[in-house]
Amino acid sequence: MNASTTSKKPVIQLKGLNKSFDGKQIIAGLDLNVNDGEFLTILGPSGCGKTTVLRLIAGFENSDAGQVIIANKDVTQVPAEQRHVNTVFQSYALFPHMTVFENVAFGLRMQKVSESEIEPRVMDALRMVQLDKFAPRKPHQLSGGQQQRVAIARAVVNKPKVLLLDESLSALDYKLRKQMQLELKQLQRKLGITFIFVTHDQEEALSMSDRIIVMRDGNIEQDGSPREIYEEPTNLFVARFIGEINVFDATVKERLDEKRIMAEVEGRTAQIHCELAVKTGDKLKVLLRPEDIRLEEINNDEHAKGIIGYVRERTYKGMTLDSVIELESGMSVMVSEFFNEDDPDVDHSLNQKVAVTWVESWEVVLADEQEA
């Protein structure tokens, strides 16, 4: 649960936060630093506490214990309207009777900003989200993506130190969501404002974030860059939650050198990279992403290195061919190969006998643990 160790200055510090609802603890002793100008995503399954963290930062909920510090000021007891943060909700929460301009100007008017200053600031914010020509329209005259942008313009117009986004893209269709992911990231870079984004969508988190926090049961399971989270999961929960992954049972046979061991993986002997302190007989988990696995067809009882299995399912997805391989042990393995129509070995036949292999050192090795 340690905050990221970076030289950047934190704009938000959460120290020992606890929060319970109806006697059930949702957040347990949470510590987190969020750096100035960072795009941080809090990722986790429903009920993990991610939205509660956002609400504690915004001031919509009060913590039972701990501190919320924003820009070096303890705001734990400060009401939401006096914190330098704005929130974009999943529902957008636009005022239906107001025009786009009036929606964006609302917060400035509440702050008693002079009318001469309001118009240029609102139009600047609308230009930033490419909606300046829509200023006279009402929300019902806009598409879902345009309403989303109005909500963002309204949130950034009064220049908050931090922008909080709670599942803000989940109501959009797939194509629009992908477009908004790109636009949000570009907007964040342009503004230099710290964004804290809450989602359960792993792909969204990987594509948008500078840093990801993976949560479970009110605790931080892993804190790292998107690449670290995907390629170097610290436990089975993170590995299974982020994308697809194959988990093989392995038993240590002997250590070969500081970095490699010989192990029995699903009944076949293989060299694997493992820097854990292990001894002969120890149980391990060997993790491989579907795209890291290679298949070699076995014909005419020829000898092949690898774990033996049979092609049970094939799904053509344009760029990739996804296969399900049933190993001799009964385990199912997911494989994703780039589809090359000129390669006769890629388009495997159903029930084809294959050897499952991978490039040495691409595997992630974890100590055996209870299934997450």
From Swiss-Prot:
UniProt-listed Gene3D superfamilies: 2.40.50.100, P-loop containing nucleotide triphosphate hydrolases
EC number(s) per entry: 7.6.2.11
Residues where ATP binds: 44-51
Gene: potA
Keywords carried by this UniProt record: ATP-binding, Cell inner membrane, Cell membrane, Membrane, Nucleotide-binding, Translocase, Transport
GO molecular function, a single term: ABC-type putrescine transporter activity
Family: Belongs to the ABC transporter superfamily. Spermidine/putrescine importer (TC 3.A.1.11.1) family.
Subcellular location: Cell inner membrane
Protein name per UniProt: Spermidine/putrescine import ATP-binding protein PotA
SUPFAM superfamilies assigned: MOP-like, P-loop containing nucleoside triphosphate hydrolases
ABC transporter domain residues: 12-242
